[in-house]
Design a protein with these regions (language model features):
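A generic local secondary-structure boundary/capping motif
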Residues: 29, 101-104, 173-177
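Short catalytic-loop micro-motif centered on adjacent basic/acidic residues
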Residues: 9-10, 40, 157-161
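C-terminal helix-cap and adjacent tail motif
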Residues: 6-7, 76-86, 182-244
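Glycine-rich phosphate/pyrophosphate-binding beta-alpha loops
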Residues: 29-35
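Glycine/small-residue-rich phosphate/adenosyl-binding loop
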Residues: 43-137
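Short, surface-exposed beta-edge/turn micro-motifs
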Residues: 38-39, 109-112, 183-184
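Generic N-terminal amphipathic, Lys/Arg-enriched alpha-helix
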Residues: 1-13
Length: 244
């Protein structure tokens, strides 16, 4: 987990189906609500379809980056916990190029996966609350993360991106995706151009508190393995390797 950073640059080395199968064979043991396993994976090989996905991805990438350039978290809910309307002019954003080696060359990644989910199989226990729903993701994104962890264990690198979900309705016909299936993520895999760097993240005491949200931070006690990680050369806390 400490060495499974987002990888967006890959060599041209092909990934055989046998290796991809092995990656997914391990990833399938992810948890899901009621063990319903409502996911399916589309392995995109057709060159024309890959270019179509790239073109749609670029449009959503422009929307995403318009938020970033405005100093905003893309499509984030407001302080009341709900999303009301776009915070930027999306029509204008789609017309402004946002150069990205990954987005502009998406059709060339060795493995291009579209992870989809049957919405009727998600136990969305926060439905009806007066805030953005998040619980449904617990039944699909552990599987997506398992794909990355499994790939990493087999010498591959990868990245998950949800930007493509903005284009779900446009892609539904070309993917032959029926309702109530939805796009959960796009996953790119391959052999990394550069060695995967060690990750940096916030320390445990920065996000873990005792008894209540304003409680004291949890700190390592005697004999904690925290010091061992430092001795092994792990980087200090930070926010590197954020995903899109």
């Amino acid at each position: 987990m400490r060495l499974s950073g987002a990888v967006r640059s890959f060599t041209d080395e092909d990934i055989p189906d046998s290796l991809l199968w092995a990656v997914l064979d391990s990833a399938r043991f992810a948890p899901s609500g009621g063990n319903r396993q409502g996911w399916s994976v589309i392995v995109v090989k057709d060159p024309t379809l890959r270019r179509t996905i790239r073109d749609h991805y670029v449009v959503s990438w422009r929307e995403y980056m318009a938020h970033v350039h405005a100093g905003l978290v893309p499509f984030a809910p407001k302080s009341d916990g709900s999303w009301h309307e776009p915070a930027v002019d999306l029509i204008a954003a789609r017309l402004i190029p946002q150069p990205s080696e990954f987005a502009d060359n998406l059709e060339r990644v060795p493995v291009l996966l579209i992870v989809v989910v049957d919405l009727t199989q998600l136990a969305v226990t926060d439905n009806g609350l007066t805030r953005q729903s998040i619980v449904g993701g617990a039944s699909i994104y552990p599987f997506v993360q398992n794909i990355l962890l499994s790939a990493n264990a087999m010498g591959l690198g990868g990245v998950v991106t949800t930007v493509i979900t903005r284009q779900e309705e446009a892609l539904r016909p070309v993917l032959r995706l029926p309702r109530p299936w939805a796009i959960a993520a796009l996953v790119a895999l391959g052999h990394p151009v550069r060695p995967v760097r060690r990750l940096s993240r916030r320390e445990v005491s920065e996000f873990t508190v005792i008894d209540h949200f304003k409680g004291l931070p949890l700190v390592p006690g005697p004999g904690s393995p925290a010091s061992t990680h430092t001795e092994l050369g792990r980087e200090p806390a930070g926010r590197g390797g954020q995903r899109k």
